[in-house]
Design a protein with these regions (language model features):
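Extreme N-terminal basic, low-complexity initiation segments
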Residues: 2-14
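P-loop NTP-binding core
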Residues: 16-330
Length: 330
């Protein structure tokens, strides 16, 4: 359920509401100061915050958190800007840092799946199967990827037809969110790779996510897809997912020696200043290593961790993880 925070463990679960009362059982309310739960601020009426009354873990690290607090959708409606490359490398460096990572490929072209699927893997369940059956979980679809410590929900060409068949379904925007919900708390980072389109796959990704990361190529017409994905995100915030927040705009394929790349970066900086995202990133350079790593089924964390572009992606990953750690337990 979007906007709902939960804690796992023993004890009564209570839900805070905008009036400052806390529901500890059906039809039974207590003032928030008796329960230890804080009422939400006035701008956040309607959000439910789960907390413990009795028992439960003694520290925040031992408790589950809001199901989508660590879910990041990597989206841009322009192709070729580095969405899959960003997912691949952020996942690789996050896992190298000891984090539990899940990648979800929502693109029917399945580029991320092709790169990260193990040679001996024969997935019997893909994201298409999950959405087709309106499954309550991703059980069976989550498999180990070729990246150490990173799991994958693979995509397939059949996802296209499933998306078309789902257009008339009630609640179609929540298919991925509902399936991901039982698993999200098991990971420190969930990355959703989005296709460059306005369709049900992207809508599902942005509904399931708490954060949106937008890679933007430092080139002519760089911001073509940015405004469209931001407009889509704003519509979803109003209708479906009020928690969706811009994590950052990531400049990619930067060539410092070219004037048009520098001009594009200035334009991107202008959009960053206007959008005020949670994080600001230095540009990711255009580099051979970033193009070669996927050909070997590796992220830069394995292929060229000390290269300049590898260090840049590692820095981006560190920023993201530090922000999520701070936000989840705020």
């Amino acid at each position: 359920m979007p906007g709902c925070s939960r804690r796992a463990g023993l004890g009564w679960i209570c839900l805070t509401c905008g009036c400052g009362l806390v529901a500890v059982a059906s039809g039974f309310f207590l003032p928030h100061w008796l329960t230890g739960c804080l009422p939400p601020p006035l701008w956040y009426y309607g959000r439910t915050i789960a907390c413990f009354i009795i028992g439960g873990p003694s520290s925040a690290e031992e408790s589950a958190v809001s199901s989508n607090d660590r879910v990041v959708a990597v989206a841009n409606l322009k192709g070729g800007v580095g969405k899959s490359t960003t997912v691949l490398n952020v996942a690789g460096f996050a896992a190298k840092a000891g984090r539990r990572v899940l990648m979800i490929d929502t693109d029917p072209q399945a580029s991320l799946t092709q790169v990260t699927l193990r040679e001996d893997a024969r997935p019997t369940v893909t994201l298409a199967d999950v959405l087709r059956s309106r499954a309550a979980s991703l059980e069976g679809a989550i498999i180990p990827s070729v990246l150490p410590g990173v799991d994958l929900v693979p995509s397939s060409l059949s996802l296209e037809s499933v998306l078309n068949q789902s257009l008339s379904l009630e609640g179609r925007e929540y298919l991925l969110a509902e399936a991901l919900d039982p698993h999200a708390a098991a990971y420190d980072l969930v990355l959703i790779d989005c296709r460059p389109a306005i369709d049900l796959s992207v809508t599902n990704a942005l509904t399931a996510a708490r954060w949106m990361l937008v890679p933007v190529e430092c080139s002519f017409m760089a911001l073509d897809g940015y405004e469209h994905v931001m407009a889509l995100a704003e519509r979803l915030r109003k209708r479906i997912n009020p928690d969706l927040t811009l994590l950052g705009i990531l400049p990619t394929r930067y060539r410092s020696g070219t004037g048009h790349s520098q001009e594009a970066l200035k334009a991107i900086d202008g959009y960053v200043a206007q959008a005020q995202p949670a994080l600001r990133f230095q540009p990711i350079r255009l580099a051979v290593a970033a193009a070669d790593a996927p050909a070997y089924g590796q992220s830069l964390a394995q292929f060229a961790p000390t290269s300049a572009v590898g260090r840049e992606y590692e820095t981006v990953t560190g920023q993201i993880l530090a922000w999520l750690d701070q936000e989840v337990w705020r």
